[in-house]
């Protein structure tokens, strides 16, 4: 299969941690999606969206030959919905033909329409389109949500080089609660906010090379987003290059980024980041070491960030220890901020980049190719960490804060796989927060623990069953000087996919089985039990 199809297929594979399919607002990473972008041959990238957007996630089981490109500067994900997984399994994607039409209908009133087409009639030219429209009519109590996306893509293969291009258009509707319409604490009418976006991206890289030749990857993109409620416009662009040499096992990475927000047609906030990163790998029979450094200019202020990783095999396959230290910059832009919190009060817009300084250590291993484990401890000293508190002017909007803090995490991951028919992953994350200043007493809206359990069962390639359960601890919110607690919750989802024919599938997704209307953001309870089902045609 052509590489562009692999991108699409991998972007469509996701595991739902419960209340995702008919979520009223983006749940900010409750859905974990893994993308695999081929940067250059033998050098791969595996980006994992963290469970909570404000918690930095050190990539699991780092391999020395992997290079982890920042997920935001380089956008070839083809992800039309940021918060709702598709009932589309990896094993099924291999069996399906290239083209797909999906129709779904559910309760409460929700419909989903998706279509994907790709042409590869020529060996050196691939082009296609992806269309998606999802609408949940929740009424005034539940607040409607709507997403629409159209993506056009193409790839041209030359003698040694590949050129890829993508352009997408879309919008996302979410609704604020109108505080003036509240009666006796009950939900009243809503205020719609439509976010539009246009994205364009291009990339050229060499896929054939001699052993001593330089490998390269040049990329760039431009994103434009708007918010109707605030008459806000955000423009950001990225450009960069990756250069490496197979003999040196080193890599040079350069990235330029810029973000401008216009509020009421006036320049409101501007950020720019320039990064230059290089590393070198050393490897022995039972050990690996990576030494690297990143130099950056953030708003023209210089910054030096380290990268170090070491790995030592103590017992072949069963026990490997590792440790590392790395720093990075987390940039801000309008679209990303509204994705993290769609109820953010843009009127008080301020973009401030965050700096992560992460030290971690752990051990991992496997047994009989079925059971694997990873135990990791990490500490992240964050400068300008992004937090949200309820606005005193409106109980249904949030102000952004930037606070220095440290996050100490302990992570236990267990995985079990039986052939290709059954796999189960259990991940436990526990967090301790230490605020650097006495002004803010809590890490607002950040959980103290998160436990996810994901299960997939393939029954004779005829029926596929997915069960996912999420346990999240309580979070805190502040309104003025008063603190409030968002209770912890349990959320479970069940998905069934019946392959009636090689070109026809019937699916059913039952989300939030327990029907709990919990709060991801204060004063915004989620939808309860919801069901969506439909058919998928391939041709």
Where do the language-model regions lie?
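Outer membrane beta-barrel strand-and-loop segments of large Gram-negative receptors
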Residues: 348-352, 363, 374-427, 438-440, ...
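Outer-membrane beta-barrel "beta-signal"
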Residues: 65, 69-72, 503-507, 526-539
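Outer-membrane beta-barrel translocator/channel fold
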Residues: 137-207, 256-272, 292-307, 315-372, ...
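Outer-membrane beta-barrel translocator/receptor signature
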Residues: 81-85, 92-101, 105-150, 161
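Repeated loop/turn-to-beta-strand initiation elements of outer-membrane beta-barrel proteins
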Residues: 124-127, 160-165, 209-216, 247-254, ...
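C-terminal beta-barrel architecture of Gram-negative outer-membrane proteins
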Residues: 430-437, 445-499
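Residues on the lipid-exposed face of transmembrane beta-strands in outer-membrane beta-barrel proteins
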Residues: 115-119, 129, 152-156, 200-206, ...
């Amino acid at each position: 299969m052509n590489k562009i199809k692999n991108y699409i297929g991998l972007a469509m594979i996701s595991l739902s941690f419960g209340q995702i399919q008919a979520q009223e607002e983006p749940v900010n990473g409750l859905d974990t999606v893994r993308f695999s972008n081929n940067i250059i041959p033998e050098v791969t990238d595996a980006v994992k969206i963290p469970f909570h957007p404000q918690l930095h996630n050190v990539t699991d089981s780092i391999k020395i030959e992997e290079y982890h490109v920042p997920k935001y500067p380089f956008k070839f994900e083809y992800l039309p919905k940021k918060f709702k997984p598709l009932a589309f399994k990896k094993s099924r994607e291999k069996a399906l033909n290239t083209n797909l039409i999906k129709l779904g209908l559910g309760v409460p009133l929700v419909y989903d329409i998706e279509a994907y087409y790709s042409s590869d009639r020529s060996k050196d030219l691939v082009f296609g389109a992806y269309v998606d429209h999802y609408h949940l009519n929740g009424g005034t109590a539940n607040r409607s949500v709507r997403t629409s996306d159209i993506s056009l893509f193409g790839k041209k293969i030359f003698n040694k080089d590949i050129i890829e291009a993508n352009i997408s258009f879309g919008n996302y509707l979410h609704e604020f609660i109108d505080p003036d319409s509240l009666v006796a604490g009950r939900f009243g009418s809503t205020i719609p906010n439509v976010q539009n976006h246009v994205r364009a991206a291009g990339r050229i890289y060499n896929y054939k090379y001699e052993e001593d030749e330089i490998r390269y990857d040049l990329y760039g993109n431009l994103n434009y987003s708007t918010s109707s409620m605030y008459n806000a416009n955000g423009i950001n662009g990225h450009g960069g290059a990756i250069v490496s040499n197979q003999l040196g096992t080193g890599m040079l990475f350069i990235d330029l980024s810029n973000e401008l927000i216009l509020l009421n047609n006036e320049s409101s906030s501007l950020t720019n980041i320039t990064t230059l990163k290089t590393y070198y790998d050393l490897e022995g029979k039972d050990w690996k070491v990576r030494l690297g450094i990143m130099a950056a200019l953030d708003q023209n202020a210089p910054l030096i960030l380290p990268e170090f990783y070491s790995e030592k095999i103590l017992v072949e396959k069963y026990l490997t220890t590792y440790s590392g230290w790395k720093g990075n910059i987390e940039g801000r832009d309008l679209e990303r901020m509204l994705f993290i919190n769609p109820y953010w009060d843009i009127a008080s817009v301020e973009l401030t980049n965050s700096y992560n300084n992460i030290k971690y250590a752990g051990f991992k291993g496997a047994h009989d190719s079925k059971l694997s484990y990873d135990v990791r401890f990490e500490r992240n000293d964050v400068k300008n960490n992004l937090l949200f508190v309820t606005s005193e002017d409106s109980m249904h909007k949030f102000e952004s804060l930037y606070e220095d803090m440290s996050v100490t995490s302990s992570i236990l991951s267990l995985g079990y796989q039986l052939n290709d028919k059954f796999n189960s992953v259990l991940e436990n994350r526990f967090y301790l927060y230490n605020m650097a200043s006495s002004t803010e007493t809590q890490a607002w809206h950040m959980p103290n623990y998160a436990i996810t359990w994901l299960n997939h069962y393939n029954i004779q390639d005829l029926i596929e069953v997915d069960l996912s359960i999420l346990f999240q601890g309580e979070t805190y919110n502040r309104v003025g000087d008063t603190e409030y607690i968002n209770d912890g919750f349990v959320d479970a989802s069940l998905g069934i996919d019946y392959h009636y024919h090689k070109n026809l599938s019937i699916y059913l997704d039952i989300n939030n089985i327990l029907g709990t209307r919990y709060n991801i953001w204060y004063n915004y309870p989620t939808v309860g039990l919801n069901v969506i089902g439909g058919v998928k045609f391939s041709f």
